[in-house]
Amino acid sequence: MKRFISACILTIPLLLSACTPPIPPDVLASYAEKEVLCANGDVIVKASENTQNVIQSGIDLYVTSCPDAKVSIDNEAKDPNIVVTDYSAAEPEMCNAAIITTSLMNQFSTLVYYGEGLDGIFLSPEAVRGLLTGEITNWNDQKIAVTNPDFELPNIPVTFVEVENLHASDKAFIEWIKTITGKDIEIKPSKVVPDFQTLLQDFGTLNGVFSLLPSNIIYDNALTYANLKINDQDFLFESTAFAAASSQVSIFAETNKVTGALNSEVQPATDIGTSSTTNSWHGISYYDYGLCKDDADNSARTFMRFLSRLDAQGQFETYGYFALTEPLRVKVAGKIGEKLPTPSFNPEDLAQN
């Protein structure tokens, strides 16, 4: 028996699988963070005008480690290798027979506005509902005043401008407000425009305008956004609230799929370095990406694996998107990496995990 163990230890670097049980994908994924896999086949990513910048940032980071990689974005591609979507009408349709589908990143929505004397206001769910349904027609309405006692609210008419196709995070925000108020919400914009570029023309020029927008548009254009006051508690539209919401996740793992969804029954994770939790922002959606086709070298899968790395996820916030919570991210990386080369590591490290 001792000889067997001794021999096993001596041959671990070469025959680890013969002496240990199969290593779970989650464990392999955590070790894979230390390495960057590269593949040089052509990879076409179908994204959208909204996600193009954040995906391009991932490509640029990938190419710094893999200079021979050939990854490009084609938002009109008929036969892409990868599709990125939130499943709303504003984003591409997922490929019909995806080889694997996993979550990629989070997005959040809130109301944004432009109006003299309105900076820094808090809105109650009742006020948000009134603005979205058209019941509130002036910014000095009592439903807005009640959560802003130190403001002398201006007498400005409300103008609600919205794009034709809402994002999934916009719809999640509406559902959140609907749940809190216990009332249906049928949004009634004063003006509907085809795209964000047209919508943004009114911000900075039309006094009293507001819209419901996703975080990437808010961040890209430095728009003034609304925080919420719910049951006398402040809910802030900021990264700690986003992290709290992303930690409230149900993970759905199937044969070819690992995705996340908000579960408000899950206790939010505590803030880093503290024992407290931030109030979660439940206007959250998940962007998924699907592997539609690949080459013999797994070039598309390799790029997807790179986007699930912590360093790649960490730069999403610059573009108004946010990293997956760690348990989901590691499971995603493990699922994507199932057909990729096993990462090298010191076998002694395995005993410590």
Predicted regions and their residues:
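N-terminal segment of the mature folded domain
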Residues: 20-148, 152-154, 186-221, 231, ...
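Bilobed "Venus flytrap"/periplasmic-binding protein-like clamshell domains
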Residues: 49-57, 164-182
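Extracellular structured ligand-interaction cores
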Residues: 106-108, 155-157, 284-288
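Sec/Tat-exported extracytoplasmic proteins
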Residues: 62-66, 87, 113-115, 132-140, ...
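Flexible, solvent-exposed loop/hinge segments that line or gate ligand/substrate-binding clefts
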Residues: 82, 87-89, 188-313, 317-353
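Sec-dependent signal peptide recognition
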Residues: 2-10
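Non-catalytic, conformational "gating/processing" segments within enzyme and secreted inhibitor domains
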Residues: 141, 149-176
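C-terminal motif of bacterial Sec signal peptides marking the signal peptidase cleavage site
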Residues: 13-18
